[in-house]
Curated annotation (Swiss-Prot):
EC code(s) of this entry: 2.2.1.2
Protein name (database record): Probable transaldolase
Organism: Clostridium perfringens (strain 13 / Type A)
Origin superkingdom: Bacteria
Gene name linked to the record: tal
GO MF annotation, one: transaldolase activity
Entry GO terms, CC: cytoplasm
InterPro entries: Aldolase_TIM (IPR013785), TAL/FSA (IPR001585), Transaldolase_3B (IPR022999), Transaldolase_3B/F6P_aldolase (IPR004731), Transaldolase_AS (IPR018225), TSA/FSA_arc/bac (IPR033919)
Upper lineage: Bacteria, Bacillati, Bacillota, Clostridia, Eubacteriales
Amino acid sequence: MKIFIDTANVEEIRKASKLGVLAGVTTNPSLIAKEGRDIKEVIEEICSIVDGPISAEVMALECDEMVREGRELAKIHKNIVIKIPMCEEGLKAVKVLASEGIRTNVTLIFSPLQALLAARAGASFVSPFLGRLDDIGNPGIEIVTQIAEMFALHGIDTEIISASVRNPMHVLDSAMAGSHIATIPYNVILQMVKHPLTDAGMKKFIEDYNKAFNK
């Protein structure tokens, strides 16, 4: 499973990139708004740091405007993937953009059937939201498992991006469920690095070394 980072904070992306694990980035209008910067400027900088799919979301809710915005975003860099919300107008926009060779990531997926429709419309990626489903008492990982099984059964090559990832267990569950990608906040990536026994082991190695060499 590939690891994306879910942020528009350039410094977080830069730090995570140095770990050597990032294969892509997902952003959304809310994340970019937090940065208080021009969307084009932020995306260009992100593309200069990570050489992989960079998801940038349209703001429009009607097909024609989604397509127009998508075309403009796609001009920024060859790695741009257009994030489109799951809705009727969104599916129409995905079909048009896909016919023009522009990759899309259909977001706000909360059911396997939504994922199927998005894939058949031509989406390159679908993003089921784990955390938000958990919030309403529906285990988010269940739809990731169902989507992965359905896509494998029918030979659908649309990639699954597990999104709304809240903790390391979401990442592990996604990997075991067959998700192709998990897009992860920076703080969760840092949690994945840590383990109490690793820290204790490192401390003991240093203590033993210092004791042996009288340091």
